[in-house]
A protein has these predicted regions:
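Short, surface-exposed beta-strand/beta-hairpin micro-motifs centered on an aromatic residue
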Residues: 89-95
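N-terminal signal peptide c-region/cleavage motif recognized by signal peptidases
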Residues: 14-18
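Short amphipathic beta-strand segments in non-cytosolic proteins
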Residues: 71-83
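Primarily secretory-pathway and cell-envelope proteins
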Residues: 20-74, 107-153
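A short tyrosine-centered beta-strand micro-motif
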Residues: 99-105
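Bacterial N-terminal signal peptides that target proteins for export
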Residues: 1-7
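Short hydrophobic alpha-helix segments
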Residues: 85-86, 115
């Protein structure tokens, strides 16, 4: 967790010097950062993956176009809110304690939910992809998802 804070501080410093700002959030023991809509954000997120326990991806349609402006809430297995926010890009990296969680997300009136479990240490995040209906041509252009190993439902 200490390393994640150092890396988050570095991301904030980088973001402050670039036109693209990346939002870093902390609630209790949970930390998260969302973005990836532009190349600078993708680079910053890539640098943070080694400290994350969970990765959320928000995509649209059968071809998996990336989405931004997705509202989400992550709840623990007892239903308590662990964190909530609005993803400014298609990818969110979370650092949450080991356990079972549920993510509820909404985009333009469509709602999606998924359960996930965190059992891994930071550096090998559990990936959860939420697919929303829509035309991928109206979303952020797909970016070599096959290389990233993203499987679209």
């Amino acid at each position: 967790m200490k390393h994640f804070r150092i890396i988050l501080a570095s991301a904030l410093a980088i973001a402050a010097t670039n036109a693209t700002a990346i939002d870093v959030n902390t609630t209790g023991s949970a930390q998260w950062v969302c973005g990836g809509a532009g190349e600078q954000e993708r680079i910053q997120l890539k640098g943070l993956e080694s400290e994350a326990t969970t990765e959320l991806m928000f995509v649209s349609g059968k071809r998996g176009g990336y989405l931004a402006d997705v509202d989400f809430v992550v709840r623990d297995h007892k239903g308590g809110t662990e964190l909530q926010g609005r993803a400014g890009g298609p990818k969110c990296l979370l650092t949450v304690p080991a356990g079972r969680y549920r993510v509820d997300a909404s985009h333009e009136g469509a709602k999606r939910s998924a359960n996930f479990q965190v059992t891994r240490a930071p550096g090998n995040p559990t990936r959860t992809v939420l697919t929303f209906p829509g035309d991928p041509s109206e979303t952020i252009a797909p970016l070599a998802q096959e290389k990233a190993g993203v499987k679209v439902k």
